[in-house]
């Protein structure tokens, strides 16, 4: 029997969202390279429209370089930098911002087209508007992050950097979740504990991504480059972990505490992922997804250790970030397996709204 014509719009929507997810993943990696190459403050202005074009003449390049020379990073870290060296860091930041503009256009224009055609159901339409709003917010958060390094600091705030990264990956996860739900299939029948552990794994993955961004922002991966010991012990002394006052500042500013937290949560994530895989295998429910997630977290932990031991060279740092995106994707998909997939075209009058349970086992 031929495919139902009403499903054709959803096929186009799925392709579109998959492209957007891929572009976001690329942008996150370019952002990681921008951070690792210390390029994020090379453009000291935020011009959403006119900033699309890079400098096109010697005079424009000189103006951009002179603007960079006014900030503390140049004066304290890069004094004596040549114009050729400046161009290298400029292109990283400019590429990162350009990708943001491309993603915005690639999301908005097809979205408006689908809205005009009436292809999107109410639930999907609302969700996509939320995703678009988060994307617009992300641009503002990016400038908020950059602004933190323009007056008194020689780098951006690690807290703002972590916020910027996690928001990008929250948007990415929302798109992946939506893609999975747009694939028409029933939810997997599974014990409640499997659903709960899948949800906890996803939540802890986001916390770990935040901690990883703090490590990157503080350059904390370039110190304490031993494993399994850190600062000469398996568990550092409380005096070293909590010396800043008030105590909670250590969670964000203390290099030792931030790296230690990142390590400890990695161990907890790995243990929970393995237990989840064993439980899923015994319950015969989403066992393949659980195993894939456990393997990915195992590989990510091993890669993180190697990256630490080599003091975060750019190649290993980017590989670690790419693997983190894969872990997040698998964690989202694993939780989504316990939620129903639905078709969301306006023509599917009989289809449940996005997020409404469907019956069946798969």
From Swiss-Prot:
Name by which UniProt lists this protein: Heme A synthase
HAMAP family (UniProt xref): HemeA_synth_type2
Reaction it catalyzes: Fe(II)-heme o + 2 A + H2O = Fe(II)-heme a + 2 AH2
Subcellular location: Cell membrane
Cofactor: heme b
InterPro entries: COX15/CtaA_fam (IPR003780), HemeA_Synthase_type2 (IPR023754)
Its job: Catalyzes the conversion of heme O to heme A by two successive hydroxylations of the methyl group at C8. The first hydroxylation forms heme I, the second hydroxylation results in an unstable dihydroxymethyl group, which spontaneously dehydrates, resulting in the formyl group of heme A.
Similarity comment text for this entry: Belongs to the COX15/CtaA family. Type 2 subfamily.
Pfam families according to UniProt: COX15-CtaA (PF02628)
Record-listed E.C. numbers: 1.17.99.9
Binding partners and assembly: Interacts with CtaB.
Gene Ontology CC terms, in alphabetical order: plasma membrane
Transmembrane portions of the chain: 12-32, 102-122, 128-148, 159-179, 198-218, 264-281, 289-309, 312-332
Membrane topology according to the record: Multi-pass membrane protein
Pathway stated in the Swiss-Prot or TrEMBL entry: Porphyrin-containing compound metabolism; heme A biosynthesis; heme A from heme O: step 1/1
UniProt entry keywords in alphabetical sequence: Cell membrane, Heme biosynthesis, Iron, Membrane, Metal-binding, Oxidoreductase, Transmembrane, Transmembrane helix
Organism: Rhodopseudomonas palustris (strain BisB18)
UniProt record, GO biological process: heme A biosynthetic process
Sequence positions that bind heme: 262, 320
GO molecular function terms listed in the Swiss-Prot or TrEMBL record: metal ion binding; oxidoreductase activity, acting on NAD(P)H, heme protein as acceptor
